[in-house]
């Protein structure tokens, strides 16, 4: 890419480097072909119908078929101290429950993964807030659940699918003679809070509580009435206290989850209730994994040990941080919360890996602005089968923002969308005349 080295090209390229123009092209024509302003985004509209198979991105078919799958899971006791090997090249803040695809070719990494397969298949992913940070204080255990070895141009390559399991605090880091880091960590527990009404509610009367049956659909007027009636009965014991009912609902897991689900339905109109975790802990992690926030905010969420507080923070972020700007420019708006939509079963954002081993957490939006497109569309190693990708850069600073995806067939819907990498985005709070400055707004963290 223009103005960047080969190392950065490999990180931003989804597939192999392809010739963009014949060698005898003129320099001026080549420049026009190499960098053009994206005009489609100005007229982009949210797709009414999506006929793309949303299960394809989550299966990571670009890694190849016939991967060896493992069953069962490894969970360590809360507050226990464990020594876990660290995979060095993974620069990502992994959330429990989040899928992590990897493509490893360094002999040290290949050897390490082989050893892990023979043991508990668990490694540590350290959480760094920025590249310059030398020591991480927190992280997440990751467990390999699918694995494949192959040779590419005589080089042994290991392809892996792993999933985040448990949060931990780093106690000590040591490097072995073979160069592999070993992390001594303390597994962080999840604080499960009782119901907000448990202190004033008589247990003997619990069996007498009769709640109305849940509605089949959440879109009609009946569902709203059902929720109001349900809330009234659930918090009826608030009448015995000096505090109003709405105050207790602010710290009620079910109420918080319902408010977040309303936001998620704006991103995915076809969102099904049974596709989301019912457990508040798992649900809070699912939401954290698909929020387009920077590493600083994400580490703050990872530190929180209570699902209630995590849900409150996530709802606060979703309500306030409605604008996504270029992280390098900081003031160039790329997209907004209203343009986000889901093209995957796991939500609007997921982690993908390119052939060079770089992991990108990619957010799907149907409209983006202030972008230049670099090169011609390519289907090589596409994370969304049936779509060709084109590298997209910030129009102001030329930093890599993501890719534009265009359908290869006319009957596909959507015909185009944008995949923006989380590491290039900065969530911001829009400033209005009636509001205080964004840097003075404090999020619920």
From Swiss-Prot:
Membrane topology term: Peripheral membrane protein
Cellular localization per UniProt: Cytoplasm; Nucleus; Membrane
Cleavable signal peptide: none
Skewed-composition ranges (Basic and acidic residues): 1-10
Pathway: Protein modification; protein ubiquitination
Stretches assigned to the CULT domain: 321-429
Superkingdom to which the source organism belongs: Eukaryota
Binding site for (S)-thalidomide: 381, 383, 389
GO biological process, one term: positive regulation of protein-containing complex assembly
The protein, known as: Protein cereblon
Name of encoding gene: Crbn
């Amino acid at each position: 890419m223009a103005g960047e080295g080969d190392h950065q090209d490999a990180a931003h390229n989804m597939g192999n480097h392809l010739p963009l123009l014949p060698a005898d092209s003129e320099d001026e024509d080549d420049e026009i072909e190499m960098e053009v302003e994206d005009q489609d985004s100005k007229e982009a509209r949210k797709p009414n119908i999506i006929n793309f198979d949303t299960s394809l991105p989550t299966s990571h078919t670009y890694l190849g078929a016939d991967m060896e799958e493992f069953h069962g899971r490894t969970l360590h006791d809360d507050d226990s101290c464990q020594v876990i090997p660290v995979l060095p090249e993974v620069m990502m803040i992994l959330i429990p429950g989040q899928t992590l695809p990897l493509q490893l070719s360094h002999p040290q990494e290949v050897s390490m993964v082989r050893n892990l397969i023979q043991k508990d298949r668990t490694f540590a992913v350290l959480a760094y807030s920025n590249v310059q940070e030398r020591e991480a204080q927190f992280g997440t255990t990751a467990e390999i659940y699918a694995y494949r070895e192959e040779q590419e141009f005589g080089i042994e390559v290991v392809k892996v699918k792993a999933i985040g399991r448990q949060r931990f605090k780093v106690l000590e880091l040591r490097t072995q003679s073979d160069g592999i880091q070993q992390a001594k960590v303390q597994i962080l527990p999840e604080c499960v809070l009782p119901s907000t009404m448990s202190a004033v509610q008589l247990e003997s009367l619990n069996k007498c509580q009769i709640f109305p049956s849940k509605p089949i659909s959440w879109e009609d007027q009946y569902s709203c009435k059902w929720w109001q009636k349900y809330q009234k009965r659930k918090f009826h014991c608030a009448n015995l206290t000096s505090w109003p009912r709405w105050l207790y609902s602010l710290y009620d897991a079910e109420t918080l989850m319902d408010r977040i689900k309303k936001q998620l339905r704006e991103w995915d109109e076809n969102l099904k209730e049974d596709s989301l975790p019912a457990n508040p802990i798992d649900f809070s992690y699912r939401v954290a994994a698909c929020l387009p926030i920077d590493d600083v905010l994400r580490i703050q969420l990872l530190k929180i040990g209570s699902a209630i507080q995590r849900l409150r923070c996530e709802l606060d972020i979703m309500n306030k941080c409605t604008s996504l700007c270029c992280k390098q420019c900081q003031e160039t708006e790329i997209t907004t919360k209203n343009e986000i939509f889901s093209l995957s079963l796991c939500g609007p954002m997921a982690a993908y890996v390119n052939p060079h081993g770089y992991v990108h957490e990619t957010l799907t939006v149907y409209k983006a602005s202030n972008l230049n497109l670099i090169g011609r569309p390519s289907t090589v190693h596409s994370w969304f089968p049936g779509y060709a990708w084109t590298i997209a850069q910030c129009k102001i600073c030329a930093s890599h923002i993501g890719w534009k995806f265009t359908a290869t067939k006319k009957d596909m819907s959507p015909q185009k969308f944008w995949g923006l990498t989380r590491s290039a985005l900065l969530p911001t709070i829009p400033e209005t005349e009636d509001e205080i400055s964004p840097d003075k707004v404090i999020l619920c963290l």
